[in-house]
From Swiss-Prot:
IGPS catalyzes the conversion of PRFAR and glutamine to IGP, AICAR and glutamate. The HisF subunit catalyzes the cyclization activity that produces IGP and AICAR from PRFAR using the ammonia provided by the HisH subunit. InterPro entries: Aldolase_TIM (IPR013785), His_biosynth (IPR006062), HisF (IPR004651), IGPS_HisA/HisF (IPR050064), RibuloseP-bd_barrel (IPR011060). One of its GO terms (cellular component) is cytoplasm. The keyword Transcription regulation does not apply. It comes from Methanocorpusculum labreanum (strain ATCC 43576 / DSM 4855 / Z). Its EC number is 4.3.2.10. The active site is at D12, D131. It catalyses: 5-[(5-phospho-1-deoxy-D-ribulos-1-ylimino)methylamino]-1-(5-phospho-beta-D-ribosyl)imidazole-4-carboxamide + L-glutamine = D-erythro-1-(imidazol-4-yl)glycerol 3-phosphate + 5-amino-1-(5-phospho-beta-D-ribosyl)imidazole-4-carboxamide + L-glutamate + H(+). Coiled coil: none annotated. This is Imidazole glycerol phosphate synthase subunit HisF.
Amino acid sequence: MGLTRRIIPCLDLKAGRVVKGVNFEGLRDAGDPVELASRYNEQGADEVVFLDIAASKDNRDTMIDVIGRAADELFLPLTVGGGIRTVKDIQDILRAGADKVSLNTSAVKTPDVINEGSHLFGNQCIVLAEDVRRNYEMRDGVTPIHLADGRVCWYEVVIYGGSQRTGIDAVSWAQEGVKRGAGEILLTSMETDGVKTGFDLEITAAISENVDVPVIASGGVGTLEHFYDGFVKGKADACLAASVFHYGEMTIRSVKEYLASRGVLVRL
C-alpha cells in the first residue's frame, strides 16, 4: 500500500444549501456548504465533493457562486457533480474554481462528453461516477462477481439517482470510461448506500483490479473498520462518506488515526 489513501467527505447541495442534516457544534449555519467544507478542511480532509442533487438551470448560478466561495476559502481539491451535461458545463464549473467534475448520468447518455472533457481540460479533471446495483440474472457479456454469501451476480450501472437500469456492466463501463479519458472512478453501490453496513467490497475490488486509475469507494460507511476494509479488501484509493461525518459520529482525524494505527498510509 505505497500510495497515501484519501478520506473524502461529500456534501449534498440543493439550491446552494447542504440538504443532508448536519450536526456540528458551533456552526453558525449548518446549511452553508463553504462553512462545512472549511470544518472538514480543518479536520484533515484530503478533498471535498459537492453534489448538486437538484441540478437545474436555475441552480447553476447559485452553484457557481458556492464553488467560487469554496475555492477562495479552501486549500484542498474540490470535486463538483450533478447536472453536468456538456463541455460548457464542465468549463463553467472548473472556471468557477472546482478542481474536478464528476459525470454520472450524462456520461452514460452521451459518453463523448468524457472524451471531450478530458481532451480539453485533462483527464485529472474528469471523474466518472458510477451508481451500480446487483443483478442476479446472469447473461453473456457481463462480469461475474462472486459474493461472500456464495451467490454470483453482475453489477449493473443505474442512472437518474438509481431509478433507471441501463443493462450496462459496471466493470466494462469503468474500463470504457477510463479509455475515453476519465482519470478517476467514483463508485457507489445502491446495495449498501445509506445502510451503514460497510462498502460493497466485491464490486469495489473488481473495479479497482480492472482499471489503472484511482477508485473512490462510496456508500455504506458506519464504522472505522469499514474504512479500513474499503482500502484493504476493496483496494480503493479513497473512501467517501457523508452522514457519519455530518452527524459527528466520527471525525476525519479519528478515521485517519485509526487507519494509521492499522498500517494504512494516510496524510495526518
